[in-house]
């Protein structure tokens, strides 16, 4: 089973994808971890690296190619990244979108990265604008189009343990006999 988890920074992707993978006995791959490793290799913050990526499209393409290869060649995995749902094409069994109010996301990021909330919020908004622009330019993806996802959740409504219960219940309720089909991924062009 391939499950993708996508959403904006601070939406709980990493925490909940790791918890879901653990609960289901699946592997977990985080695009955010890969991106942060790439930033650290260049001695940059994720925000600086995002801005650098605007000038060097190969950075996004390298990351996205790796994630696409993982999504299309592996099973028994929870793949988590901003574009995981899109990059998995039709290979994903479930595509989830996580979100939360920007104030909540900024608080989470501030706590994780040990920085002031107002700084985390400003950086998050810059990062999101940067990513939205690049995804449209590179692949013709409208990151705000949630129609490809099987379910979208506001993660601010549950704590992580309870939210994983919600996700597992969603997966358990799935009945292949009543499945009328996944939302297709159309109109995008992957140029890695």
Swiss-Prot record:
Write out the annotated subcellular location. Cytoplasm
- Kindly state which reaction or reactions the protein catalyses: CMP + ATP = CDP + ADP; dCMP + ATP = dCDP + ADP
The chain's disulfide connectivity reads none
Chief subcellular location: cytoplasm
Is the keyword Nucleotide-binding assigned to this protein?
yes
Q: Name one GO molecular function term.
A: CMP kinase activity
Pfam families the UniProt entry points to: Cytidylate_kin2
Which is a Gene Ontology cellular component entry for this protein? cytoplasm
Alphabetically sorted, this entry's keywords are:
ATP-binding, Cytoplasm, Kinase, Nucleotide-binding, Transferase
What superkingdom does the record give?
Answer: Archaea
Q: Does the keyword rRNA-binding apply?
A: no
Concerning InterPro entries, the annotation shows: Cyt_kin_arch, Cytidylate_kinase_dom, P-loop_NTPase
- Residues the entry annotates as binding ATP: 7-15
**Which enzyme class, named as a word?**
transferase
Q: What is its EC number?
A: 2.7.4.25
- One Gene Ontology biological process: pyrimidine nucleotide metabolic process
Give the record's family classification. Answer: Belongs to the cytidylate kinase family. Type 2 subfamily.
**Name recorded for this polypeptide:** Cytidylate kinase
Per the UniProt record, the lineage of the source organism begins with: Archaea, Methanobacteriati, Methanobacteriota, Stenosarchaea group, Halobacteria
This chain is encoded by the gene named cmk
């Amino acid at each position: 089973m391939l499950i993708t988890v996508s959403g904006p920074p601070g939406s709980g992707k990493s925490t909940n994808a790791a918890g879901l993978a653990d609960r289901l006995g699946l592997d977990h791959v985080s695009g955010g971890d890969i991106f942060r490793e790439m930033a650290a290799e260049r001695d940059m913050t994720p925000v600086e690296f995002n801005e650098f990526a605007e000038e060097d499209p190969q950075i996004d393409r390298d990351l996205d190619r790796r994630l696409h290869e993982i999504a299309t060649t592996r099973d028994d995995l929870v793949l988590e990244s901003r574009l995981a749902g899109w990059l998995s094409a039709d290979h994903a069994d479930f595509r989830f979108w996580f979100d939360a109010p920007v104030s909540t996301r900024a608080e989470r990021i501030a706590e994780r990265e040990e920085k002031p909330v107002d700084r985390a919020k400003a950086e998050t908004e810059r990062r999101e604008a940067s990513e939205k622009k690049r995804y449209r330019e590179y692949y013709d993806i409208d990151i705000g189009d949630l129609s490809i996802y099987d379910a979208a959740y506001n993660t601010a409504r549950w704590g992580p343990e309870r939210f994983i219960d919600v996700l597992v219940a969603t997966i358990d309720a799935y009945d292949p006999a009543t499945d009328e089909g996944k939302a297709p991924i159309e109109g995008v062009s992957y140029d890695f």
